[in-house]
Amino acid sequence: MNYASELLKTTESRESYNLFFRSLRVNHILAQVYWFKAESGARETSDYENAAKYAALATEGVETLIPVTTAGLNAVMANNDASYPGLYMCGTTYGATAGIYGSTWYYMGYNPNNVPVNPDFYALFTPEDIRYDAYFMAPGILANSWPDGGAYGSKNGNCVLFKPEEAYLILAEALYHTQGDAVGTLNKFKSFRNAGTANGLSGESLLQEILNERRKEFFADTDKRWLDLKKYGGTISRHLTFFKKTYDITVDTDAYQYALPIPLDELQQNNAISQNEGWVQIEF
């Protein structure tokens, strides 16, 4: 990616040839890489500085393109905002059912109604936040129109890559870790969402506010929440029921589940590697 970044200085970017070979997106990817690497086993002292550098580059010229209304948020998720700099991607479940979002057949009655969200997640919002009406139709209840504001909400698992909002939040977090103006950057992001300010926050309270904004902004957005939990050592608890059997599952900070299993085809093609600790081979 660093080579691609250098190449962009002398080579014209053509989206008709490659959607990823564009300065804004290459810088965004580099910001993501250094952001996650900074808390990994491969971390280096310069990681957050690099994350801040590339995140700042990924926010250049995008401020006026970020939606500041609920209707604007819905337009992005429906791919109806041609000026939005993110890259809209249709999920492979398009036209079928998607486990993350629910059912695409809601209009036929095949979809759960009045789905509750985690109470502590709901408590992060104020009604003035533009995401509130996009996410909820009643206190603590997921809106049927989510995520795109349509009559039934498109539940195809589509997503938007390279959201400029993510670049702002990476920048705020990186500046927090490098004693930069994290509050100012976070306030800029909050202004897009009418979500108050971070004035007066410092230390762990400021970091938690940044993580809270990530949690709110990236609700059910690919694996972002999972990466945050993995990055900062969160504990996951779930009470699940399958075929009338209940399971209480807790994934602790150092649990093996945070290192995902290596796919079977990779194990079969490379006998020099072994499955990650804790995972057992399932044969069908």
Briefly describe each language-model feature range.
Residues 112-118:
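Acidic/Gly/His-enriched mid-domain segments of enzyme catalytic cores or analogous surface patches
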Residues 104:
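Short, helix-capping/interhelical loops that line the mouth of catalytic, cofactor-
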Residues 1-101, 122-284:
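Acidic/polar-rich alpha-helix caps and helix-coil junctions
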Residues 107-109:
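Aromatic (Trp/Tyr) and acidic
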